[in-house]
Regions:
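A short beta-strand-turn-helix
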Residues: 1-13, 55
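Short pre-active-site segment immediately N-terminal to redox-active cysteine/selenocysteine motifs
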Residues: 11-12, 19-22, 65
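Hydrophobic beta-strand anchors of alpha/beta hydrolase catalytic cores
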Residues: 15-16, 46, 69
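Typically the conserved alpha-helix immediately C-terminal to a functionally engaged Cys/Sec
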Residues: 27-40
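Structural microenvironment flanking redox-active thiols in thiol-disulfide oxidoreductases
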Residues: 51-57
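Chalcogenol-based redox active-site neighborhoods
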Residues: 60-61, 87
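Structural micro-motif
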Residues: 62-70
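Non-catalytic, surface beta->alpha helical segment in thiol-disulfide oxidoreductase systems
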Residues: 73-98
Length: 98
């Protein structure tokens, strides 16, 4: 979890996908996040947190439904949404904070 804390405290925006392996919408979100990762390159971070394996982190950020997406910058959440989101929406949210 030290790596997670380093990432969210970065001056680069970090999109965190709180997901579960059994979640249908999470599985649909995964390829969109992979494409987003390649599009933003090193200007932003995109990471996935399995809520079943990291329950304390999910609880800390009050994740009640999945997928939940949170953009962090300098350790602070600057955008949050639940459910499936398209590439253009996610890319725009990250670019707002670059």
């Amino acid at each position: 979890m030290n790596d997670f804390n380093e990432l969210i405290n970065s001056s680069k925006p970090t999109l965190v996908d709180f997901y579960a392996t059994w979640c249908g919408p999470c599985k649909m979100q995964a390829p969109i996040l992979e494409e987003l990762k390649s599009k933003v390159g090193d200007t932003a971070n995109v990471v996935k947190i399995d809520v079943d394996r990291n329950q304390e982190v999910a609880a800390r950020y009050h994740v009640r439904s999945i997928p939940t997406l949170i953009v962090f910058k300098n350790g602070e959440p600057v955008w949050r949404a639940s459910g499936l989101h398209q590439l253009d929406v996610l890319e725009a949210k990250l670019k707002e904070h670059i």
